[in-house]
A protein has these predicted regions:
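Elongated, amphipathic alpha-helical interaction scaffolds
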Residues: 1-302
Length: 302
């Protein structure tokens, strides 16, 4: 038997709390609307949904996923704004964890078959990189040895919702369509103005145009802080990927995460976010954010 350090294997980076996508689709009504649009079903009772979203488990980045049970299916929906060919492996780790939780009281050593819900993996992409309208990502593409029929396969469907892509789907699910409009506005405006200004303009326009109006009016402060963080993080992740890999290996994951947190705090402070807003978005205490904010920014560039 192989010994596995579960605390190490399931190490979670809790720097990030959530995304706007999660905020919208953790609402059962919105999630059911999206499910119906994708499957062509016509369910009307949101209480049919049993949401099973893990608290950042397994993921080493944002909690971008929404998983739920309905009609004997376990559907995992994730939002992405950057290209990520590793999603099939992440989905495999995630579905394994969910199946483990769903069957915790079952006898997996017995003679009776234990039934499990059929999985579905969907990625909603709205990044700036050019991507096909629909793409299948396969776990087998990640194998170091490519030969014959893979013994273990997982397929995830990527749906591009940027611009005019998948227009019928966005028309069938108004919430998804309006989410795409809002994020497209931010992305377009960041080409000519500061990020915080771009977010404010996008929010004001969407409220006037009845795009996510009720949601943005009710959650404006949190949605604003989250939007600024998400789009800044998108650029930040690319920079970290290019410049920080070797350094992260040398100093270790824990120290690397600490430095990342410090840079995020200073960046968000420079964006005009308050201590409480940063603490909320980064899932840290206000005391910890104040401690970092009081430090000399120059010390964090070392």
């Amino acid at each position: 038997m192989t010994n596995v350090n579960t605390s190490e294997a399931l190490h979670v980076n809790r720097t990030f709390k959530s995304t706007l996508f999660i905020m919208l689709f953790e609402d059962k009504k919105n999630l059911l609307e999206l499910y119906n649009a994708i499957t062509g079903k016509h369910y009307a009772d949101p209480e049919l949904l049993e949401i099973n979203t893990l608290e950042n488990a397994i993921y080493m980045s944002m909690k971008n996923d929404v998983s739920f049970l309905i009609d004997g299916r376990l559907s995992l929906y994730e939002h992405q704004s950057t290209k990520n060919p590793n999603l099939p492996l992440r989905f495999l780790l995630y579905i394994s964890h969910l199946y483990s939780r769903l069957t915790v009281k079952e006898n997996l050593y017995g003679e009776t078959i234990v039934q499990i819900p059929a999985p579905e993996f969907l990625i909603f992409y709205n990044g700036k990189d050019k991507m096909p309208e629909r793409q299948i990502l396969r776990l087998s593409d990640m194998y170091s040895v490519q030969e014959g029929q893979p013994k273990l396969e997982l397929e995830a469907t990527l749906l591009n919702i940027s611009g005019s892509n998948n227009q019928k789907l966005k028309e069938a699910c108004r919430t998804l369509g309006e989410y795409a409009i809002y994020t497209d506005k931010i992305r377009n405006y960041t080409e000519t103005m500061e990020l915080s200004e771009a977010v404010d303009r996008a929010m004001d326009e969407c409220i006037r145009e009845d795009v996510l109006r009720e949601f943005l009016m009710k959650h404006r402060a949190e949605a604003r802080a989250m939007s600024i963080f998400e789009y800044d993080q998108e650029r930040h992740m690319q920079q970290e990927r290019e410049a920080g890999i070797e350094k992260g290996r040398r100093i270790g994951l824990a120290e690397g995460e600490e430095q990342l947190l410090r840079r995020q705090v200073q960046k968000n402070l420079s964006r005009g976010m308050s201590i409480s807003e940063i603490a909320e978005v980064l899932d840290e205490t206000e005391e910890r954010i104040r401690e970092i904010a009081s430090e000399d920014p120059g010390e964090q560039a070392e």
